[in-house]
UniProtKB/Swiss-Prot annotation:
Residues 367-380 have a biased composition (Basic residues). Signal peptide: none annotated. Part of the subtelomeric hrmA-associated cluster (HAC) containing genes that alter the hyphal surface (such as reduced total chitin or increased beta-glucan exposure) and perturb inter-hyphal interactions within the developing biofilms, resulting in a loss of vertically aligned polarized growing filaments. Consequently, this hypoxia-typic morphotype (called H-MORPH) with altered biofilm architecture leads to increased hypoxia fitness, increased host inflammation, rapid disease progression, and mortality in a murine model of invasive aspergillosis. This is Subtelomeric hrmA-associated cluster protein AFUA_5G14930. Keywords: Cell adhesion, Virulence. Residues 23-32 have a biased composition (Polar residues). Coiled coil: none annotated. It comes from the Eukaryota.
Length: 396
């Protein structure tokens, strides 16, 4: 369907085509065939009653036709419109890009849907997008996550905080698995494309390093202080013993004056013994300090970095479903996808070289862990509550 051009609205070359179109009749007079939103991927429209379920598409917008959804990327235009009609999340089958994994494509789409949902205050769609970002992000490297996030980061509202927190969490996880992750060449791919994104990521990296250093100080300082305090008390006790020896030595000297030179020899021997005691005290104090220093060194070396986890095989299953939208045919039926966490690869059961997409409310998606031959863990189905209430049908 060709869109009508209007002089007051400018469109860029790659701008998506979805737009709102005003109907001359009121909502109660319009039939199901009348449309307020149209888009051409594929050619279809949205009945009026569905639009009326969303307050953000108020009359103030409808009286200024056409309302162009310019913030919706054309790759997820179908997903947004399908959500408006059914309340569910759906992506279409498309040819895979060379070198791109199937699950990587769906992760990027989830990012694009999140950006569109934030722009037009579609809370339920935003909830879907967040969940799929987290699900598909489990198999993505930090480099792929940053690449997808960089594409939408500066397009989000200024008060957006969820994606920033998600990126920070993924950076922390990546650093805990590899202390040299921030020094790798791949980490700096794409730097300069979005200065705002680069600045925030740099701030996150500095915060992560600062937290690690602070944690080291908190863990090492109290133990070192306790060791030093204990050694100081021991030294003080020994000093007290020496002082007592000095007092006794004074008494011996007085006795030596009265009794004779023989006792002077005894006093001298006592003085030698006192010197030996003092040397022993010094050696004990030095040993205590060495033990404290060794403990601090071991604590400083140990950053508490966990070992790299072994690869985990997960499977996603979509049960039978049919498209409830009026958008035309889309990918449907039985499909089972499997990806390996270590290889970031997604394998559709039909082995087709395309991204199959999926259609289901989130409750229909199950995540399973396969049995491990060594550990023999039992399979557990993930039960996830429904994220969005179904949109009521027209006329009800």
């Amino acid at each position: 369907m060709a869109n009508k051009k209007k002089p007051s609205i400018k469109k860029s070359v790659n701008e998506p085509n979805p737009h709102l179109k005003q109907s001359h009749a009121s909502g109660s007079q319009q039939s199901l065939g009348d449309s307020l939103i149209e888009y051409n991927q594929p050619e279809s429209s949205i009945p009026v009653c569905y639009i009326q379920n969303y307050p953000q598409f108020s009359d103030s917008y409808l009286y200024e036709p056409p309302f162009i959804l310019s913030k919706v990327n054309e790759e997820v235009g179908h997903t947004v419109v399908h959500f408006l009609c059914t309340g569910n999340y759906e992506t279409l089958r498309t040819a895979s890009e060379p070198g791109a994994s199937k699950i990587g494509i769906e992760f990027r789409r989830s990012m694009l849907v999140y950006q569109a949902a934030k722009e037009y205050d579609l809370y339920d769609l935003e909830t879907y997008a967040k969940k799929y970002i987290e699900v598909f992000g489990e198999s993505m490297s930090i480099f792929d996550i940053m690449e997808a996030a960089r594409e939408i980061y500066s397009k989000l509202p200024k008060d957006e905080i969820w994606l920033t927190g998600y990126i920070y969490k993924q950076l922390e996880i990546a650093f805990s698995l590899d202390r040299n992750i921030f020094q790798r060449v791949d980490f700096y791919d794409g730097v300069g494309k979005d200065p705002n994104f680069d600045k925030d990521v740099m701030r996150m990296v500095v915060n992560i390093y600062s937290e690690v250093l602070s944690r080291q100080l908190d863990e090492t300082t109290p133990e070192g202080s306790i060791a030093e305090d204990g050694a100081a008390e021991d030294c003080a006790a020994e000093d007290g013993a020496v002082e007592d020896g000095v007092v006794e030595e004074g008494a011996v000297e007085e006795g030596a004056v009265e009794e004779g030179a023989v006792e002077d020899g005894a006093v001298k021997d006592g003085a030698v013994e006192d010197g030996a005691v003092e040397n022993g005290v010094a050696e004990e104090c030095g040993a205590a300090e060495d033990v404290a220093d060794d403990g601090a060194l071991k604590e400083a070396v140990n950053l508490g970095i966990p070992s790299q986890p072994s690869g985990t095989a997960l499977s996603f299953e979509w049960d039978h479903w049919t498209s409830g939208s009026k958008m035309g045919a889309s990918f449907s039926g039985n499909s089972q996808w499997k990806y390996e966490k270590d290889t970031n690869s997604l394998y559709p059961e039909n082995k087709a070289e395309e991204s199959g997409g999926f259609n289901a409310a989130y409750e229909g998606i199950k995540s399973k862990k396969k049995k491990d031959k060594k550990k023999k863990k039992s399979n557990k189905d993930k039960k996830v509550e429904e994220l969005a209430e179904p949109v009521p049908e027209c006329g009800r």
